[in-house]
Amino acid sequence: MNVVKDLLKSGKTVIGTAGSAFGDMAMLADTGFDFLLFDTQHAPVETKQLIPALQSMRGKKAAPVVRVSSNRADLICFALDAGARGIIVPMVNTKEEAVAMVRACKYFPLGDRSNSGVRGDWGEYNPDMMRDGMTSEAYRSYLDMVNEELLIIPMIETQQAIDNIDDILSVPGIDVLLVGPSDLSIELGVPVDYPSDTYQRGLDTIAAACRNHGVVPGMYFIPPGMDPNFYVDKGFKFFTVPWARWAAEGVQNGLAGIKR
């Protein structure tokens, strides 16, 4: 149901790219990426603006993943209702914040997410479903499936989070611990100096803790000039890469082969 979770469970590297709120994402969602990431923290968009893009991805290969702007239950709930199959929350620094995130993502009894009917790729919303014969047991089965399939991704971006990493990773339900590369480098006193020993030691600490807890470490993006395989070799199996340059190269190669 959620291809990203299946890939992570099998130990594969999961690669995504940035999605846009202002366009039909159907084509990009079927190019081979495992997920499209929609940002509402730094991008000038609100979750409600993502609805057409998320709906255009229905039935496509890539899973829609949304980064909300903060660790608020209402923002998380609305992003999920809009069709997200994964949630990223920035600046998760403590176990308590991780617990709050997970509970906002999951339905009772694993969480506190409010229910508004069958949503997204898990089914069509139909307010008459109970009257028309959907049993209570079947509805419970749907809720349990969503709880199981949803991708939950807190971000680690501060020294405080590194200090609390074992407590954070002890929270059940976390699938990926996602490094915010630039913010973490600033916190470690080496702003955007990604090759520095200090920064790399921080990444090694994160990767080791994730291994110990059975959680996949990821990078929000691969820093400019760095080889993605460098991070894969460290154990980071979830990240985004830019697609525009690859698309431009493909167009250029295609045009170059035509007599003009």
Predicted segments with their positions:
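Alpha-helix-loop-beta-strand connector modules within alpha/beta enzyme cores
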Residues: 47-81, 104-111, 145-147, 195-218
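Conserved N-terminal beta1-alpha1 strand-loop-helix module at the mouth
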Residues: 1-64, 70-71, 103, 152, ...
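Histidine/lysine/aspartate-rich catalytic loop segments that bind and position anionic ligands
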Residues: 172-192
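Catalytic cores of alpha/beta
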Residues: 26-30, 66, 71-85, 89, ...
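N-terminal amphipathic alpha-helix/helix-capping segment at the start of soluble metabolic enzymes
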Residues: 1-18, 132-148, 204-206, 211-212
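Conserved anion-binding
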Residues: 74, 86-172
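C-terminal helical cap(s) of enzyme catalytic domains, especially alpha/beta-barrels
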Residues: 53, 57, 95-111, 244-260
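Hydrophobic faces of well-ordered beta-strands that scaffold small-molecule active sites
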Residues: 14-19, 36-38, 64-68, 87-89, ...
